[in-house]
Amino acid sequence: MGQETEINKRYQVAKERYQAIGVDTEKALKTLKDIKISMHCWQGDDVKGFLNPDGELTGGIMATGNYPGAAHTPKQLRQDLEKAYSLIPGKHKLNLHAIYVDTDEKVDLNEIEPKHFTPWVEWAKEQGLGLDFNPTFFSHPMFKDNYTLASPDKEVRDFWIEHGKRSRKISEYFGKELGQTSINNFWVPDGIKDCPIDRYTPRKRLMEALDEVFAEKLDEKYTQEAVESKLFGLGAEAYTVGSHEFYMGYGITRDKLICLDAGHFHPTEVISNKLSSLALFSKGVMLHVSRPVRWDSDHVVIMDDELIEIGRELVRNDLLGITNIGLDFFDATINRIAAWVVGTRNTQKSLLKALLEPTADLKKMELENDFTSRMAITEELKDFPFGDVWNYFCEINGVPVGLDWLKEVKAYEEDVLLKR
C-alpha cells in the first residue's frame, strides 16, 4: 500500500506540472491504453518456428547468441508470451509467422490452412489478444537461388504464390474469430549478392506474382495487407527486388499498407522522417519497430533518439489512426522474455512522451516563427516527471512498476526456462 500511495502522490505532482503547460495527463493515459502493440512471436525461439525448427535460418537474417530457455514447442512459446504480456500494461496483439503452425499434421507452406492455427486463436481469445500474420518466404528448400516470388523458375514462383494465397485466408480467419483486423505483412527477401545486370525483370516478376496472390478480394474488416521493403540482407548485399521504391509504388497503386522496418534502410536513414509523407499518399502504415546497429541487426528496441522521434511523429501528426505498430527484433544473447518486455514497454514509453507534449501550442509557435519558445519548451520538457506518469500507468494497469518486472523474469527463468 505504501508504494501505491507514493506512486499516486508522485503522479499527482506530475499531473499538476504538466497541467501548467496545458497537458492533460489523464487524456494521455487513456489514449495510450487504447494503442495496441503487435508483439512478435519470433523473439521467443530465435526465428526457428515449428514447421522445420532444425532447418537453416535463411533470407539474409541472423539471430546470434545461445541464451538458455528458448521455446521449443507452441505450448512453451505461449507460456513465455503469457509471462511477457503480464508485465506489459494494456491489451495488445501477437504477430505470428506462418512457420509457427500448431498441428500434428505434416504440412508444407503451400498447404497451410486456418485449422493449423486454431490453437493460437483459442489461446488469443482466452488472453484477450488480437493476431497479426506474416507469410514466411524464407527458411525453406523452395527458397532457391535467393529467390521466391521473383524467381525465374515458374515452379518456385507457383509454390510461393500458393503460400501467399493461403496466408491471406489464415489472416482473414484471425480477424473473423477475434473481432480485430489482422494485418498480414508480406516481406520477400529475394535478392542478389553481387551487382545484377537486370534489375527490372525480377521486379516485374515480383509485381505480377503479388498481383496473383492478391487477386481475390477479401473483406478488410477482417484482414489488411502490408508490403515491406528492405535495402539489403546477408547474401543479397547488392540488390533486393522488393526495394523501398518498389513497395511504395506497389502499395499506393494496389491500395496496400506500407510496412516500414526501422532496420531496412541505409544506416543513417530513419523511418520517422517517412511517416508524414506516407500519410499523405498511402492507405496507411505498418511499423516494424527495431534497432539496427550498423546493419539490420534486429537489436532489442531501446529508448534511443529514433524511437522517441517515431513516437513524436505518430502523435504530433495524428497518425495513430492509420498506423499499426509492430515490433521486429530477435536477440538470443539475453533472456527472451526480458527482450519482449523491454522493447514493448519502451515503445509505449516513446508514445507517452509524445502524448505529454503541448502539441497544439508548439505547432502554433512554429507557425508564428517563435522558434525561441519552441526550443525552450521542448528542452524543458526533457526534465519533466515523465517517469512518474509512466509508473502510474503501470500501477493502474496492474503490471510491475520500475524494475520490479525484472525480478519476475529472473524467477521465471529459474523456475521454467533453465529447466528446458
Curated annotation (Swiss-Prot):
Enzyme class label: isomerase
Superkingdom of the organism of origin: Bacteria
Cofactor: record remark: Binds 1 Mn(2+) ion per subunit.
Binding site for Mn(2+): H264, D296, D298
Keyword flag Transmembrane: no
Pathway: Carbohydrate degradation; L-rhamnose degradation; glycerone phosphate from L-rhamnose: step 1/3
EC numbers: 5.3.1.14
Cofactor: Mn(2+)
Pfam families the record matches: RhaA (PF06134)
An annotated Gene Ontology molecular function: manganese ion binding
GO BP terms, alphabetized: L-lyxose metabolic process; rhamnose catabolic process
UniProt main location, coarse: cytoplasm
Keyword annotations from UniProtKB, A to Z: Cytoplasm, Isomerase, Manganese, Metal-binding, Rhamnose metabolism
Location of this chain's protein in the cell: Cytoplasm
PANTHER family: L-RHAMNOSE ISOMERASE (PTHR30268:SF0)
Family statement: Belongs to the rhamnose isomerase family.
Stated role: Catalyzes the interconversion of L-rhamnose and L-rhamnulose.
HAMAP family linked to this entry: RhaA
Name used for this protein in its record: L-rhamnose isomerase
Species in which this protein is naturally found: Listeria monocytogenes serovar 1/2a (strain ATCC BAA-679 / EGD-e)
Taxonomic lineage of the native organism: Bacteria, Bacillati, Bacillota, Bacilli, Bacillales
